[in-house]
UniProtKB/Swiss-Prot annotation:
InterPro entries associated with the record: Bifunctional_P450_P450_red, CysJ-like_FAD-binding, Cyt_P450, Cyt_P450_CS, Cyt_P450_sf, FAD-bd_FR_type, Flavdoxin-like, Flavodoxin/NO_synth
Region (Cytochrome P450): 1-479
Cofactor annotation: heme; FAD; FMN
One GO cellular component term: cytosol
Classification lineage: Bacteria, Bacillati, Bacillota, Bacilli, Bacillales
Name used for this protein in its record: Bifunctional cytochrome P450/NADPH--P450 reductase
Length: 1065
């Protein structure tokens, strides 16, 4: 159905001037905000040279921030800034070679870990600011933006290039600042002029060129001095730019591009941060209650004259203040985008490929009441107390996606440090009752903002011999503590790239474990999704690929890689050495291991060398043992292929996770991993009758603004472990759930556990790890290591034997916790136990509603797992289903929406016949389908035939949504076929039996283009239904069994067969 398009709103134009008279040339952003307040979340502005589409509503911003549809546009003021910033990171097009090259080279220098190295240098400059303020006479004014500009310029100069501008020792601004400010101002004003005006302003042009040459001269001297000094073990931005090649191309940056990068960092690295600091001070002075809280935190945390790195990281409220300051006045107020293809946003606004320039107006986005509430103009740092609740795509102070500000961590750490030190030493006074006047060049800052200060306590009034070694010494001590003798000689000369394709996180988890294992031996490792390494694979070192299949198709983060692999010519991957491991489920025999097998074959066909045989693990078999066996063989093969040797003197492995008890709070990273949001429970009711001994819940949740879904989508839920199991763990290890701890890891990337920040043991065990999965052999082997009691040690070792493990552990679902309670002689430490537990996985539920009925709410249908434990002891309760069953109205859950890669959506043509098979909770997605069909019928659309095959035990006990389904049949929406397996006086009947009865009609429908959908149990029901259909096709068309199988495969390949089943990885 063709989308109805609408014209984008536009203010009144003024002939050839367009909308220019509406724009204040000195404060264009404020003009845009005023227009947005009148015209809404999207409007267009006609300038002298082009038309700009300005977007500020968070739903529209979410669309234009989709990097598959839009990319950064270097237009307007940024295009003018290229005169002196060239193809630096900020002003280059994404497709320009130097952007990707510089991005790859410089990313490590802006990681959170790198901030530790910069911290002492940041303190060095911050001390100079404190000393300056401490020496002021009473009633002398402080020009806040001017001093913040001095501070931030000196900081980026020292940290980035080991160059001292010494701004605090000058009466006037450094010449670079003068030239830069004039050049930025001129770049912005060039946009406001007619061509004839621009040509006549020859003096301005001459000054512009002079300023550019002045900046070039300073930067070229910095580069020349570094080269002449031999780059004596510097490890800063300049050193990396001069010496480090791009890991993808092997090329280094040329001198001209280094010049552009330095200018980019000198501008972007200080202008935006100085504005942030100035706005933060302004907002604190205007909000005394927030200033009081900030002083309280600073006095509690900063107990030394100069803050340590760890102390700055504890300034949580200060970071919230900075985030809220950036919300109200983001110092980089906009970013521009263009569409990669003709498209439509907001369901009705057409955007032309490459022609239409879109500008995201960030200050107005940050004032979107639909996302932030009605109090958007109030300064409320508490909005950022729980980052998971910050509205998605409604907060963009650092830009978007891969083109977001690379220096975000640098800016926030510097600003937090400086604000902390200023409040530590000074009382801030708004002596003139300053009224905000926003000044704009390329960035925003308060204009003519002056304050006075009074000393709070003994300040740093004399030059301090800074000891940047404090944090470094602590780090060195930690490193010495965790260093161990490497078990493999030569591993430090090897590099390893681990690629994964994963929809549910299992394959990704294996990939990260492989990288961690190698990293602990000194191997240089990298872990990324398959789609993120399109275009090149390294010919040095090893490549490991871990992937699953989804109904025979690549996972969502692997499809592009598979397509790229197909298009390569023979021998293009010659020199690449690789191995593949596949995750799957043998119940889907026709597609089992299809994608891992295909990638393995394609890699070999394109010239790569397989250094170890492909491994397979079956989710319905002994998955863990198959994985362990493959890892053992693969590492052995890798040692032979890369000439490595085993170190006979290796130390016994110990935990890489360390734990420290503290008294502060922290949080969980899993919600951020899945980009999850909070959703409120609206309804939670039982679907089974009171006479049933089982439970199925109908649960409705409200969606936050901006969240969308369609029929056939999944709701991913991040569950919470039961209080009963958590208490068992706490009791076993003698711990108190209220205790706060800080966890730190050495040599591993443990992504699911909150590291380096305080978290309670209760929260840690509730939200981070799986505690009742069957114990793995690796866990049991570790228990053996920590068990001294000979009888217990022998019993544990026996569980590892072939057959015993499968019968006694897997089949009975005996967890590591069960074993620890049984074998009290095992003295494993809590942190090692925690490290061995896998990440708490989201549970996916088929959505059982249609957005056509209510776009801001959805429902799921949850079968509650609560039955006698297979071990014969007690009751087994499903983690997620019981958690959800116990939620009440207005309770919040953490969840996210995913679209499965399985053709599970209604046909585009509503007249296409559909066949739906969904016994039990498999009815869920079809309820959404039927809601959509009812709306389509109400709109007068003609509907094709629809057959629903539903099964349950008894019509009076577990006939889910019975009244709805019977009404749907009465109203002509479906033909309903029900199978009852526990009805007294009748044989057990399942859905496949009914399908067999209707086989002639169903095969005819499928032969004529009908769509087939199966939802439910993938281990038994779905394969039986497939077998029944293939047997029917074989009988009716008189073909072989293989030809019938090929027919069903073709139906799936044509996109007419969708499966949504519980089995598989």
């Amino acid at each position: 159905m063709e989308k109805k398009v609408s014209a984008i709103p536009q203010p009144k134009t003024y002939g050839p001037l367009g909308n220019l008279p509406l724009i204040d040339k000195d404060k264009p952003t404020l003009s845009f905000i005023k227009i947005a307040e009148e015209y809404g979340p999207i409007f267009q502005i006609q300038t002298l040279s082009d038309t700009i589409i300005v977007v500020s509503g968070h739903e529209l911003v979410a669309e234009v921030c989709d990097e598959t549809r839009f990319d950064k546009s270097i237009e307007g003021a940024l295009a003018k800034v290229r005169a002196f910033a060239g193809d630096g990171l900020f002003t280059s097009e994404t497709h320009e070679p130097n952007w990707k090259k510089a991005h790859n080279i410089l990313m490590p220098t802006f990681s959170q870990r790198a901030m530790k190295d910069y911290h002492a240098m940041m303190v060095d400059i911050a001390v100079q600011l404190v000393q300056k303020w401490a020496r002021l006479n009473p009633n002398e004014n402080v020009d806040v933006p001017e001093d913040m500009t001095r501070l931030t310029l000196d900081t980026i100069g020292l940290c980035g290039f080991n160059y001292r501008f010494n701004s605090f020792y000058r009466e006037t601004p450094h010449p670079f600042i003068t030239s830069m400010t004039r050049a930025l101002d001129e770049a912005m004003h060039q946009l406001q002029r007619l061509d004839i005006e621009d040509k006549l302003m020859w003096r301005t042009k001459r000054q512009f060129q002079h300023d550019i040459q002045s900046m070039f001269s300073l930067v070229d001297n910095i580069i020349a001095e570094r080269k002449s000094s031999g780059d004596q073990e510097e490890n800063d931005l300049l050193s990396r730019m001069l010496n480090v090649p791009d890991p993808e191309t092997g090329e280094k940056l040329d001198d001209e591009n280094i010049r552009f990068q330095i200018i980019t960092f000198l501008i972007a690295g200080h202008e935006t941060t100085s504005g942030l600091l100035s706005f933060a001070i302004y907002f604190l002075l205007k909000n005394p209650d927030k200033l009081k809280k900030a002083y309280e935190e600073v006095d509690r945390v900063l107990t030394d004259p100069t803050p340590t790195y760890q102390q700055v990281m504890k300034l949580k409220y200060m970071r919230m203040i900075l985030n809220e300051s950036l919300r109200l006045w983001p110092t980089a107020p906009a970013f521009s985008l263009y569409a990669k293809e003709d498209t439509v946003i907001g369901g009705k606004y057409p955007i032309k490929k490459g022609e239409d320039r879109i500008s995201v107006l960030i200050p107005q986005l940050h004032r979107d009441k639909d996302a932030w509430g009605d109090n958007v103009e109030e300064f409320q740092p508490e909005r950022f107390e729980e980052l998971d609740k910050v509205p998605h795509h409604a907060y963009k102070p650092f830009g978007n996606g891969q083109r977001a500000c690379i220096g975000m961590q640098f800016a926030l750490h510097e600003a937090t440090l400086v604000m902390g030190m200023l409040l530590q030493h000074f009382e801030l006074i708004d002596y003139q009752n300053y009224q905000l006047d926003v000044k704009q060049t390329l960035t925003l800052k308060p204009g003519d903002f002056k304050i006075r200060i009074l000393p709070r306590k003994q300040t740093i009034s004399h030059p301090t011999v800074l000891a940047p070694t404090e944090d470094k010494l602590k780090n060195d001590e930690i490193k010495q503590h965790v260093q161990k003798t490497p078990s493999i000689i030569g591993a430090d000369n090897l590099s390893l790239l681990v690629l994964y394709g994963s929809d549910t996180g299992v394959a990704e988890g294996i990939a990260r474990e492989l990288a961690d294992t190698a990293s602990l031996e000194g191997v240089q490792t990298e872990v990324v999704a398959l789609n993120d390494r399109i275009g090149s694979l390294p010919k040095e070192g090893a490549v490991l690929i871990v992937t699953s299949s989804y109904n025979g198709k690549p996972p969502s983060n692997a499809g592009q890689f598979v397509q790229w692999l197909e298009e390569l010519k023979p021998d293009e991957l010659k020199g690449v050495q690789y191995a593949v491991f596949g995750c799957g489920d043998h119940n889907w025999a026709s597609t089992y291991q299809r994608i891992p097998r295909y990638i393995d074959e394609q890699m070999a066909q394109k010239g790569a060398t397989r250094f170890s045989k492909r491994g397979e693990a079956d989710a319905s078999g002994d998955f863990e043992e198959q994985l362990e066996q493959w890892k053992q063989n693969m590492w052995s093969d890798a040692m032979k292929a890369f000439g490595l040797e085993l170190n006979k003197n290796m130390e016994k492995e110990r935990s890489t996770l360390s734990l420290q008890f503290v008294s502060r709070l922290g949080g969980s990273p899993l919600a951020r991993t899945y980009e999850a949001v909070y959703a409120s429970i609206l309804e939670n009711r039982e679907l089974q009758s009171s006479s049933s001994d089982r439970s199925t819940r109908h649960i409705e949740v409200s969606l936050p603004e901006g969240a969308t879904y369609k029929e056939g989508d999944h709701l991913g839920v991040l569950p919470v472990n039961s209080e009963k199991n958590i208490n068992r763990i706490l009791k076993r290890f003698g711990l108190n759930g209220k205790d706060q701890v800080i966890l730190s890891a050495s040599g591993r990337s443990i992504n699911h556990i909150p590291l380096d920040s305080p978290v309670s043991l209760l929260a840690l065990l509730s939200y981070s790890v799986e505690v009742q999965e069957a114990a793995t052999r690796a866990q049991i082997r570790e228990m053996v290591t920590f068990t001294a009691c000979p009888p217990h040690k022998k019993e544990l070792e026996a569980l590892l034997e072939e057959g015993v493990y499968h019968e006694q552990i897997l089949k009975k679902r005996i967890s590591m916790l069960d074993l620890l309670e049984k074998y009290e002689a095992c003295e494993i430490r809590f942190e090692r136990f925690l490290e061995l537990l896998p990440a708490l996985k989201p549970r996916y539920y088929s959505i059982s509603s249609s957005p056509l009925v209510a776009h801001n709410r959805l429902s799921i249908t949850v079968g509650v797992v609560n039955a006698p434990a297979w071990s014969g002891e007690g009751t087994y309760e499903g983690v997620a289903s019981n958690y959800l069953a116990q939620r009440h109205n207005k309770d919040e859950i953490i969840c996210f929406i995913r679209t499965p890669q399985s053709n599970f959506e209604l046909p585009k043509d509503p007249e296409t016949p559909i066949i739906m098979v969904g016994p039990g909770t498999g009815i869920a997605p079809f309820r959404g389908f039927l809601q959509a069909r009812r709306v389509q019928k109400q709109k007068g659309m003609n509907l094709g035939q629809a057959h629903l095959y539903f099964g349950c035990r008894h019509p009076e006990k577990d006939y889910l949504y019975r009244t709805e389904l019977e009404n749907d049949e009465r109203d002509g929406l479906i033909s309903l076929h029900t199978a009852f397996s526990r009805l007294e006086g009748h044989p057990k009947t399942y859905v496949q039996h009914l399908i067999k009865q209707d086989r002639i009609n169903l095969i005819s429908l499928l032969d004529n283009g009908a769509h087939l959908y199966i939802c439910g149990d993938g281990s038994k029901m779905a394969p039986d239904v497939e077998d029944t259909l293939c047997q029917a096709y074989q009988e009716i068309h008189e073909v072989s069994e293989q030809e019938a199988r090929n027919w069903l495969d073709r139906v799936q390949d044509e996109g007419r067969y969708g499966k949504d089943v519980w089995a598989g990885i």
